[in-house]
Amino acid sequence: MELFIVESPTKAKTIQKFLGKGFLVKATLGHVKDLPEKELGVDLRTLKAKYVYKRGKKKLVEQLKKLSRRSSIVYLGTDPDREGEAIAYFLKKDLEKVNKNIKRAVFYEITPEAIRESIRNAGDVNMNLVYAQFARRILDRLIGYLISPILWKEFKNYKLSAGRVQSPALRLIVEREREIQNFKVKKYYYVKALLRKGSEEFWAIYDYRYENPSDAKIIAKKLEKGYFSVYKVEKKKEKVSPPKPFITSDLQSEANAKFGFSSERTQKLAQELYEKGYITYPRTDSYRMNEKKAKEFMNYIEKKYGKEYVGRLRRFREKATAQGAHECIRPTSLREEIPEREELRLLYDLIFRRTIASLMKEMLLEREKVTVEAITPELKHPVYLVAKGLKIVFDGWSRVYPSEITEEKLPELYEGDLLDLVKTTLEERKTQPPPRYTEGTLIKTLEKLGIGRPSTYATIVKTLKERGYVEVKKKALVPTEIAFQVVEFLMERFPTLMDYKFTAQMEEKLDLVEEGKLNWKSVVYEFMEKIFGKELEMVR
């Protein structure tokens, strides 16, 4: 018998179907070991950590030991990231006491071919990934255990917490709210004319911003006595590239905008789709797509929509943080629909259509700019108004993945055409404050700043809500009063923790640990020194 160990029962069930007899697939139900719940669990001088079994996991490991003893080989098929590697590491340490033949099987999608290939190429646990997880876990523990109690004491509120990613994210939300509160709305005005050619009407706008409505009214009144004609017609073709395939941040952002899903809900659903074998691994920051799969998708496009819709597999400049072997989030097959509950079907359909759209031809647009000349005895010089039109010449990728681009139709206009004036009017506009963050826009902002990674995005807003820092109103994240107070306190007491640049640099250093280019302890020591400074001696 060969033993194959994964984290979740769903994943185990899917893989068991693929491997059949001769294999036994078992699940750990997540991490088996972690730092203790009721103590720091880390020696601050040596960084030696005290990892203990999570509740119920010692018994589970004993059961796995019995199975390992009876197995010819043990494969550790946990997720292909820092957390999955740490689970594999602790399992190996326990199981190699009874069976030395233990291999790490790495795969990025749950299909028969991918699982068999992971078995053929099974190797050892990647210690660089494990060290990066140690560093991440210890950093988070230090902040949780050393800073959170300071907040409890200061604000007499035991729900409060601080975090390496959580606190800078809260700062973003609070600073945006301050911008909104300090924003002064200003009204301004444009003069518009409703014009007619034959039986067709269209609007043209005088492109001058009036602060005073009475000034705009004077011009509008004078234009009522004017003669209007087409002065110039400019047409320009424009290509609109298809969207990129999904990475974690894009998927969470899009599902939030389209379905109102929280990032945590999207991640749970995506994980379930992955474990059932429908999509590739959902925690990724790489846009890369397997060439063989891309060809299959492009053949599908040709058969379903025609050759003119087939695009190409584009190469994207990968972020420095993108892991080489990871792919974008894509379907594992050409299955258009899945026999699952509605939430899963919705998310799968979104991923399927986005993947197909990313390999289709560009949209082709024609933009039209018509300059209208108005001559009136009331004014010394002509006034020029502008009308804009937009025509979709070829729908391309938007046939599969709806675009926000809409047609703006104008009559067929030629230079010299005489036009009738129907009426003039003022259009009142207001300066807009910056919008509040939604979960989706917050994640995209954090990603742009280099804060957080695909595995952490889903938990950020969940934690902020649980701690009473934010409320969700009409999808927007609204900070509570305590959020303002905590951000102000942390900015004064622990400014480095709240510094966006420093947080991003720490993320980069964790990535370098993952690549084997930095020692994990040196990263933790540097972080401790910069965050806690002299206070570190007090807690030591």
From Swiss-Prot:
<dbReference type="GO" id="GO:0003677">
    <property type="term" value="F:DNA binding"/>
</dbReference>
<comment type="similarity">
    <text>Belongs to the type IA topoisomerase family.</text>
</comment>
<dbReference type="InterPro" id="IPR013825">
    <property type="entry name" value="Topo_IA_cen_sub2"/>
</dbReference>
<dbReference type="InterPro" id="IPR000380">
    <property type="entry name" value="Topo_IA"/>
</dbReference>
<dbReference type="GO" id="GO:0006265">
    <property type="term" value="P:DNA topological change"/>
</dbReference>
<dbReference type="GO" id="GO:0046872">
    <property type="term" value="F:metal ion binding"/>
</dbReference>
<feature type="site" description="Interaction with DNA">
    <location>
        <position position="283"/>
    </location>
</feature>
<feature type="site" description="Interaction with DNA">
    <location>
        <position position="152"/>
    </location>
</feature>
<dbReference type="InterPro" id="IPR003601">
    <property type="entry name" value="Topo_IA_2"/>
</dbReference>
<dbReference type="InterPro" id="IPR028612">
    <property type="entry name" value="Topoisom_1_IA"/>
</dbReference>
<dbReference type="InterPro" id="IPR013826">
    <property type="entry name" value="Topo_IA_cen_sub3"/>
</dbReference>
<feature type="site" description="Interaction with DNA">
    <location>
        <position position="467"/>
    </location>
</feature>
<feature type="site" description="Interaction with DNA">
    <location>
        <position position="140"/>
    </location>
</feature>
<dbReference type="InterPro" id="IPR013497">
    <property type="entry name" value="Topo_IA_cen"/>
</dbReference>
<dbReference type="InterPro" id="IPR013824">
    <property type="entry name" value="Topo_IA_cen_sub1"/>
</dbReference>
<comment type="subunit">
    <text>Monomer.</text>
</comment>
<keyword id="KW-0799">Topoisomerase</keyword>
<feature type="binding site">
    <location>
        <position position="79"/>
    </location>
    <ligand>
        <name>Mg(2+)</name>
    </ligand>
</feature>
<feature type="site" description="Interaction with DNA">
    <location>
        <position position="137"/>
    </location>
</feature>
<protein>
    <recommendedName>
        <fullName>DNA topoisomerase 1</fullName>
        <ecNumber>5.6.2.1</ecNumber>
    </recommendedName>
</protein>
<feature type="site" description="Interaction with DNA">
    <location>
        <position position="31"/>
    </location>
</feature>
<dbReference type="InterPro" id="IPR023406">
    <property type="entry name" value="Topo_IA_AS"/>
</dbReference>
<dbReference type="Pfam" id="PF01131">
    <property type="entry name" value="Topoisom_bac"/>
</dbReference>
<dbReference type="GO" id="GO:0003917">
    <property type="term" value="F:DNA topoisomerase type I (single strand cut, ATP-independent) activity"/>
</dbReference>
<dbReference type="InterPro" id="IPR003602">
    <property type="entry name" value="Topo_IA_DNA-bd_dom"/>
</dbReference>
<keyword id="KW-0460">Magnesium</keyword>
<feature type="active site" description="O-(5'-phospho-DNA)-tyrosine intermediate">
    <location>
        <position position="281"/>
    </location>
</feature>
<keyword id="KW-0479">Metal-binding</keyword>
<feature type="domain" description="Toprim">
    <location>
        <begin position="1"/>
        <end position="110"/>
    </location>
</feature>
<dbReference type="InterPro" id="IPR034149">
    <property type="entry name" value="TOPRIM_TopoI"/>
</dbReference>
<feature type="site" description="Interaction with DNA">
    <location>
        <position position="145"/>
    </location>
</feature>
<dbReference type="InterPro" id="IPR005733">
    <property type="entry name" value="TopoI_bac-type"/>
</dbReference>
<dbReference type="Pfam" id="PF01751">
    <property type="entry name" value="Toprim"/>
</dbReference>
<feature type="domain" description="Topo IA-type catalytic">
    <location>
        <begin position="126"/>
        <end position="536"/>
    </location>
</feature>
<comment type="function">
    <text>Releases the supercoiling and torsional tension of DNA, which is introduced during the DNA replication and transcription, by transiently cleaving and rejoining one strand of the DNA duplex. Introduces a single-strand break via transesterification at a target site in duplex DNA. The scissile phosphodiester is attacked by the catalytic tyrosine of the enzyme, resulting in the formation of a DNA-(5'-phosphotyrosyl)-enzyme intermediate and the expulsion of a 3'-OH DNA strand. The free DNA strand then undergoes passage around the unbroken strand, thus removing DNA supercoils.</text>
</comment>
<feature type="binding site">
    <location>
        <position position="7"/>
    </location>
    <ligand>
        <name>Mg(2+)</name>
    </ligand>
</feature>
<feature type="region of interest" description="Interaction with DNA">
    <location>
        <begin position="161"/>
        <end position="166"/>
    </location>
</feature>
<dbReference type="InterPro" id="IPR006171">
    <property type="entry name" value="TOPRIM_dom"/>
</dbReference>
<dbReference type="InterPro" id="IPR023405">
    <property type="entry name" value="Topo_IA_core_domain"/>
</dbReference>
<feature type="site" description="Interaction with DNA">
    <location>
        <position position="136"/>
    </location>
</feature>
<keyword id="KW-0413">Isomerase</keyword>
<keyword id="KW-0238">DNA-binding</keyword>
